């Protein structure tokens, strides 16, 4: 039986309820007006037939659409809402939909005001309230039991290519040990060329696809003992053409290294990940139309256990590890409405500064900084983690840092489950954890304090 999640937004208008007795949502239509979202329509699948329900009122601006691919389904919807100027009634200002396979819609509307997210399973129905505007949206969900794709062999999984259906199919396979280097070439309209250096039995195997232009290529090199864990793919249709192309690619590794965006981050957005990426496949012509990946389970320990304090928090987001350095020099903490959303640390190694990687996502509140002085080092981190409304996993809600000379202010609101990361006669020389939209988990790497 489907679970009904409370509608998020305002209390204006009349309630509507499509129910949760459908098998899937196949297509979403969203219409906008001067002030926000004024119209929604959902195409549901039931016994092989399409059942459509619409709410609100269309304007001359028409509607925009989000089509759910075969064998995929919506897992979350992000809802933005705020009060109309001079009115006590909130309306929905924007909607963003995300699917099980990582496909994300464009923002339908302006992402302003309050923000809420509904999900935690397969969405099979919607409810809410509306007048000539959409005031609120809620969902019906059922548990998600669908595997990404059947395992190919030995734990290898082939993730479906994301993007358009143009060009010829290519497949590098997933029989490699690692991806060592990525080359991306851009053209006038998007990504036109990719090349991957794979490692196999200590040798490099290079495979290329698409066609280079005079603009050449940009590169993303993977550090030793690191590997790519996910790729973000942006794609959209060429002007005047029904065929989508990849407009940008972003790569991220197990240890938190993130590439620059190779291209313009416009159009639809999808993510490929969930393990160690060991191969790619896709489609191309003189352009790159789609990109998929082969993954295997990640079994690499974050750091040697004898010098690691286990991470505390919830099991969400993507794993990252800054590694081991000589000392921590600066810490950045960014907060959102309910929890810590961003974390970064700068280090020193061999008397040289090491700029850290960003983990999580900054909000409009920015980030606060904790700067360490000469001969100062971090000896402990304390904090709290808690379950946040509409977020599947518990997230870090507060952090506080203790050094050999002082203790920082608490960054965030103290409440929930308390934790302390500390080892006697040791100092913290690196951080690791898990992050996505929020900072879900934090652990530390430590080293003995020199006497």
From Swiss-Prot:
Pfam families: Jacalin (PF01419). InterPro entries: Jacalin-like_lectin_dom, Jacalin-like_lectin_dom_plant, Jacalin-like_lectin_dom_sf. One of its GO terms (cellular component) is plant-type vacuole. The modification N-acetylalanine is found at residue 2. Keywords: Acetylation, Lectin, Repeat. SMART domains: Jacalin. This is Jacalin-related lectin 35.
């Amino acid at each position: 039986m489907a679970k009904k999640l409370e509608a998020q937004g305002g209390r204006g208008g009349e309630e509507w309820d499509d129910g949760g007795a459908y098998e899937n949502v196949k297509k979403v239509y969203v219409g906008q007006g001067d002030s926000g979202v004024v119209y929604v329509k959902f195409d549901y699948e039931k016994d092989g037939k399409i059942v459509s329900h619409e709410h609100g009122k269309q304007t001359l601006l028409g509607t925009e659409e989000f089509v759910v691919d075969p064998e995929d389904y919506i897992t979350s919807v992000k809802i933005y809402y705020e009060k109309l100027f001079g009115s006590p009634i909130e309306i929905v200002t924007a909607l963003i939909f995300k699917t099980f396979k990582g496909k994300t819609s464009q923002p339908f509307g302006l992402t302003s005001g309050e923000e809420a997210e509904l999900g935690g399973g397969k969405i099979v129905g919607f409810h809410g309230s509306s007048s000539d505007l959409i005031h609120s949206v809620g969902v019906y969900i059922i548990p998600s039991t669908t595997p990404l794709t059947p395992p190919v062999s030995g734990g290898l999984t082939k993730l479906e290519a994301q993007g358009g259906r143009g060009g010829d199919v290519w497949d590098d396979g997933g029989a490699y040990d690692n991806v060592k280097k990525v080359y991306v070439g851009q053209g006038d309209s998007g990504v036109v060329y990719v090349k991957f250096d794979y490692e196999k039995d200590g040798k490099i195997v290079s495979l290329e696809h698409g066609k280079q232009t005079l603009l050449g290529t940009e590169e993303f090199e993977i550090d030793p003992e690191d590997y790519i864990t996910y790729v973000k793919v942006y794609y959209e249709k060429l002007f005047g053409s029904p065929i989508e192309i990849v407009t940008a690619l972003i790569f991220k590794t197990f240890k938190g290294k993130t590439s620059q965006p190779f291209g313009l981050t416009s159009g639809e957005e999808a993510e490929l990940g969930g393990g160690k990426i060991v191969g790619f496949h896709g489609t191309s012509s003189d352009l790159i139309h789609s990109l998929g990946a082969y993954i295997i389970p990640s079994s690499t320990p974050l750091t040697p256990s004898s010098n690691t304090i286990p991470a505390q928090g919830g099991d969400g987001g993507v794993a990252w590890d800054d590694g081991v350095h000589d000392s921590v020099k600066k810490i950045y903490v960014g907060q959102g409405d309910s929890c810590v959303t961003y974390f970064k640390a700068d280090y020193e190694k061999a008397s040289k500064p090491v700029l850290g990687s960003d983990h999580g996502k900054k909000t409009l509140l920015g980030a606060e900084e904790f700067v360490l002085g000469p001969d100062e080092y971090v000896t402990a981190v304390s904090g709290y983690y808690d379950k946040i409304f509409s977020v599947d996993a518990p997230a870090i809600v507060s952090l506080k840092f203790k050094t050999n000379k002082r203790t920082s202010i608490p960054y965030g609101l103290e409440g929930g489950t308390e934790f302390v990361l500390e080892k006697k006669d040791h100092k913290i020389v690196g951080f690791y954890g898990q992050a996505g939209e929020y900072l879900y988990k934090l652990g530390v790497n430590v080293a003995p304090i020199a006497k």
